[in-house]
């Protein structure tokens, strides 16, 4: 129905470009099937982008360098899922190393520790996000930097820390 589609599009525009959302954000506008169909039509028309199954984005457009559509990052999608599910997440492995600047490698599949539901999310770019259930003590850090450092050092391994790592 066009009315639901207009309501959804107006709300998405208010949130701004780069916003990640799902059908559950628009349940006040109508029946779940109608909302899903409206999102499907909007994605087909190019107003929004389907990032993963059930997850959409109002894309940013790069006008300065003419790069076109800028897709949301792993972090944006993962943070949206965590917020929606009321879960805590923290990146692990090579992605934690990349976030800290200890590695230039950007992994194709990112793994997050979570206290929420474990799952795999396939992004349309062929990449993926994996949420692995963990003990609450692994998420108990009060400082995000300390948590990332701990997980990055775990990835590097005991005795494998080099002078180059220490310089960063």
What are these regions (language model features)?
Residues 133-168:
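Hydrophobic alpha-helical interaction segments
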Residues 1-80:
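Short beta-edge/loop segments at beta->alpha junctions of small alpha/beta modules
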Residues 51-54, 87-124:
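Short gly/ser-rich loop at a beta-strand->alpha-helix junction or flexible surface loop bordering the NTP-binding
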Residues 22-23, 109, 165:
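Short coil/turn segments at secondary-structure boundaries
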Residues 122-133:
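A short, charged helix-loop
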Residues 84:
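Basic nucleic-acid-binding interfaces
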Residues 35, 92-93, 145:
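Amphipathic alpha-helical interface surfaces
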